[in-house]
Amino acid sequence: MFRVTSFNLNGIRAASRKGWLQWAADHNADVICVQEIKAQEKDLDASMRAIQGPRGELKGYFFPAQKPGYAGTAIYSLHPPLELFRGFGEAEFDDEGRYIEIDLGAFAVISLYVPSGSSSEERLASKFRFMRRFESHVKTLNHRGKPYVIAADWNVAHREIDLKNWRSNQRNPGFLPEERQWIEALIKEQGLRSEEHTS
């Protein structure tokens, strides 16, 4: 079975100091997608650039934000990609390193970090712009005809069951009706399937 794992690291260097690299090495994944790396590639040591797993090396492919110590995504893969895409053609979000994709031949894997929008009205407006533009990009992905996996920090709780205090969060970014409807549209109109497995 092909195994894809995803994590929001909240800083790859901090997570590595807390044992994340060893956990990732032991996890026996084919692909590991990470969000919020908060580091430039030049600042990563060799142990962070490639993970030595039980079946071989998972090479890291990185897309950091231009702003140091902020956002960024990466993908570690046991299998060499045929193509690598950094960004989805939207400068506002590509500058923040929010999308990286590898083409593995039979299918593609995407690591995605949706903005949270919680820090200010301006950032919430930016999140809504991201949502519209990413939905358009999903249509492009569908037209390509190649299966794909999106491993993401969506920064949206889709259903009431996904959030402990959903009633008190209905006016907060991350559980706004517009955000939940966006996730619903991606599933129903664009054909995305939502799956989550923990181990």
Predicted regions and their residues:
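Active-site-proximal beta-strand elements of phosphoester/diester hydrolases
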Residues: 2-10, 106-118, 151
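Internal catalytic-core helix/loop-beta-alpha segment
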Residues: 86, 92-93, 125-142
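N-terminal, active-site-proximal structural segment of metallo-dependent hydrolase catalytic domains
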Residues: 1-51, 67-71, 186
